[in-house]
Amino acid sequence: MTLTQEFDTIAAISTPLGEGAIAIVRLSGTDALKIAQSVYKGKNLAQVASHTINYGHIFEEERLVDEVMVSVMRAPKTFTREDIVEINTHGGIAVTQEILQLLLRNGARLAEPGEFTKRAFLNGRIDLAQAESVMDLIRAKTDKAANIAVKQLDGSLSKMINNIRQDILESLAQVEVNIDYPEYDDVETMTSQMLLEKTAHFEQLLENLLSTAKRGKILREGLKTAIIGRPNVGKSSLLNQLLREEKAIVTDIAGTTRDVITEFANIGGVPLELVDTAGIRETDDLVEAIGVERSKKALAEADLVLLVLDASLELTDKDLELLELSKNANRIVLLNKTDLPEKLDINQISGDFIRISALKNENLSAVEEKINQIFFAGEIEAKDATVLSNARHISLVEEALKALKEANNGLALGLPVDLIQVDVTRCWQLLGEITGEAAPDELITQLFSQFCLGK
């Protein structure tokens, strides 16, 4: 266990700035209680029990600033393993900023982004993977993304990585003993075959973990989804239904959407970054033409394409062009306006399609099911499974797996065990970067700088 390190006392507003019922100003450090007491009138905070909430007032000398509730949590049973004080104030920018400035004038330092979580990491409260999951939980756009983050915060990924690293370390230790003390008869010899069996087992464990990466990354980051189609086929109506609110202008006038509209929607637990593109057509309108070019770019960059066709009209040359343009993408063809008589010839469409009415919100559940089928083979989230979702973690597991494969190839070619040790050690070190056991200081600083202030 890492011993708590000595730091100065930091302060920051931990709730979003703006109007609200309450706001929280947080202190952490050796002098947290002393600094809070210097601006607080109520019970003596040095004498109250830990993990209690205490009523009082904040004063600037004799001037009342706010009526507050003050939470006192003593080390080491806190998030940072330091003394923590949280001042619950009335929401609003003026009051919270004034209280923060009072704390800073009385000895606290303004916290850097993510510094509270960084202290939790440095003091051994959480490891690096758990620290990153804190931000993933804050940024989660769906319940399934939040579930993955909570499991990682609880240590599911860390436990798996630590177990694999421990097994690798034991194998490396046995190799070292054989190299350094070959004359000892009572030490089991690690033969090439024995090491190959062990590294093959480690390789399988990492392969299994890596197989969750696609699902995890989608749930964490979302699917970039382009809604395409010629003008006035119902793209904006579809966007509004998926968002469950009116974000795009819906009219009968072609060219109403003159740019690219981007919003996030929760579709069955999958975050979709929906891009409602300008209708792709020839136009003399300069602004609309720019929107059309951006639409084509969005199509090229999309993870998923929703191609909207007007089922109440016959297919046009532009419809056929879009069908051809998107044929190699992860595409769902939507025959919209099924509330009107159908005139579209379905024989002109290759592959599956779904009939919907975006105007009346009919059959959109089938779109959700199709997305699930395309990207998750029908199972979005495996129960109790450890899932890789962070791009940094995925990259490190890929590199660790590559090192193991090189070790296995060397063993298969008959290379000495001591030469193979280099690749196995590299695998062990790479996995250690996930939890922070082997992460360089520069990486740790860079990761925590991405956190929000007050966390």
UniProtKB/Swiss-Prot annotation:
Co-factor binding comment: Binds 1 potassium ion per subunit.
UniProt domain TrmE-type G: residue ranges: 222-376
Binding-site list for GTP: 232-237, 251-257, 276-279
Gene Ontology CC annotations of this record: cytosol
Alphabetical keyword list: Cytoplasm, GTP-binding, Hydrolase, Magnesium, Metal-binding, Nucleotide-binding, Potassium, tRNA processing
Alphabetized InterPro entries for the sequence: G_TrmE, GTP-bd, GTP-bd_TrmE_N, GTPase_MnmE, MnmE_dom2, MnmE_helical, P-loop_NTPase, Small_GTP-bd
Assigned EC number: 3.6.-.-
Subcellular localization(s) per the UniProt record: Cytoplasm
One BP annotation, GO: tRNA methylation
UniProt binding sites for Mg(2+): S236, T257
Positions that bind (6S)-5-formyl-5,6,7,8-tetrahydrofolate: R26, E86, R125, K455
Highest taxon above the source species: Bacteria
Pfam families for the chain: MMR_HSR1, MnmE_helical, TrmE_N
GO molecular function per UniProt: GTP binding; GTPase activity; metal ion binding
SUPFAM superfamilies attached to this UniProt entry: P-loop containing nucleoside triphosphate hydrolases (SSF52540), TrmE connector domain (SSF116878)
PANTHER family linked to this entry: TRNA MODIFICATION GTPASE GTPBP3, TRNA MODIFICATION GTPASE GTPBP3, MITOCHONDRIAL
Function recorded in the entry: Exhibits a very high intrinsic GTPase hydrolysis rate. Involved in the addition of a carboxymethylaminomethyl (cmnm) group at the wobble position (U34) of certain tRNAs, forming tRNA-cmnm(5)s(2)U34.
Annotated family: Belongs to the TRAFAC class TrmE-Era-EngA-EngB-Septin-like GTPase superfamily. TrmE GTPase family.
Name used for this protein in its record: tRNA modification GTPase MnmE
Gene source species: Lactococcus lactis subsp. cremoris (strain SK11)
Lineage: Bacteria, Bacillati, Bacillota, Bacilli, Lactobacillales
